[in-house]
Amino acid sequence: MRSIALMLALSSCVTPSSSDTPHDDPYHSTALKWHQGSIEDAFKQAKKERKLVFLYWGAKWCPPCNELKAQVFSQPRFAELMTSSVPVYLDGDSEYAQIWGELLQVSGYPTILLLTDEKKELMRISESLTYDEFAATYLDAVSGDHTGFSERLEAGISGKATPQQWRLLAYGSWYGTRNLDLHSDLMLEKRMKLIANVPTRLKVEKAILSAELLKSAAEISRDSAIVRKLRTQAVKYLDSFLDSDETIFAARTTIIYSMKPILNWAFGKNQQTIKEQSRKRWLAAAEKIRGKPELSVDTRLWGWYPEIETYEMDLPKSKASLPELQVKVRDATIAADSSATSDFERQAVISGAAHLLGRVELYDEAAELLLREAKKSVYPYYYYSSLSQLEKKRGDTNKSLVYSKKASQSATGKSTKIQWLVQDINMLISTPAADKAQQISGLLEQVYNQIFAQKDGFSGRSYRSLKRLSKMLSSYPLDSTTSKKLKGYSLRCSRLEKRAQVRCSDHFSEILK
């Protein structure tokens, strides 16, 4: 986490107003009154009332955010839980939101922070948790010794962490803050020492930490001494979270989404027997996750993803088993569609259901599901984007472009609009299309009109969208008319505040070089 002094200095560059925080989202708990003033006002209130600041960073359209609302915010007990905090909802499309995102070092939706009135971070959660998991972690952060992440990490490595600190180390997110290089040899070694010190009775905490360590290791391509050592101990770490129903439940995110790269990383050609044994354990664990009624509809549906992953691992010899897998996935998506009754559940479930259908080549059913949902959703652009990708996958270029355009034109919210416009440009660049140059020119005009109309257009997620755009356009031959337009926009950089001015100039320099 950046120093408090730096955060306060940067925050003084903007003058947050009451519009910093949007009004109540109708999908949030009706029992809880979210803070309606500026972010700074929330910290002032927390100091005055001797409370903490509970800050939720999200977007109304994002599926994981809606799962969080279904699992946690909508629960009757949530409002009571928040009595020790000032609850703040920072929507990524609200005024100054992306500047605040950088100050607080949050980017991915959703992220939950628990902060002192001096902005010291006590908790960060980005994973999907049940209400009970969330409540226990939150209460540990509130009632504990108020140590930060680095202090907890060192306490764990030295074997002096308290039970509350162990829980926060396990359930708290390690990503997106504190400038940690989770893939460095030093950090891998620290994490191995940390896991070795977890008390025997804390099986759940050890399971989560072990699963996250293997996930990080599987993302590494180098072959250092510590990586080789970790690979030789992979089975031990797998045992930590595949050993029981309790540990499987705790490490479900890794089990669902990350086991394929873990197994490929851990086991070479001479270890096929143990790899196959581990794969069977993986599939058995996924089956248990699917049968957990405490989990959200979305998580139980994604419990079928390992079945798809193992099918794809065995291609082409597994092709004969596709019809059987299609039946399983179809039945699962129908059940999820039926079970997801609230708006936030549907926003969390439907795009994932369509993705799983597409992965087993049930393209028509996936398209039908997405089209049906787009017609009744207040966020149709999310489904149109999925439709665009689906049609591109099955080779219908025209439909792919039509849905991509529908997505970008129906998108709302300042940062969201930029993100979807850039996606549409990317689709045009990567796909054969008539009058491509003219369409791209028109979309670029929309992007820059949006960017320069915003006070945080060169910050946070909006700036990340611009960096993706720079990369696309740096290798794309712009026509003279479009180049002239971009040079005109680049002249507006000098009107921005200093940091945005530098980023703006760098952006156009990359494109127009």
Tell me the role of every PLM-derived stretch:
Residues I39-K47, A70-E127, E133-A141:
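Thioredoxin-like thiol-disulfide oxidoreductase module
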Residues W57-Q71:
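Conserved redox-active cysteine motifs that mediate thiol-disulfide chemistry
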Residues T130-L188:
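Charged, amphipathic alpha-helical linkers/stalks
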Residues E151-L153, L182-P199, R222-D245, Q271-P293, ...:
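Alpha-helical repeat scaffolds
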Residues A161-R167, R201-E212, E246-I262, P293-E312, ...:
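Generic helix N-cap/helix-start motif at coil->alpha-helix transitions
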Residues A266, Y311, L357, E391, ...:
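Residue at a conserved register position within TPR or TPR-like alpha-solenoid repeats
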Residues V360, R394, T431-A434:
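Structural motif corresponding to the intra-repeat A-B loop/turn of tetratricopeptide repeats
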Residues N426-K513:
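Long, ordered, amphipathic alpha-helical scaffolds
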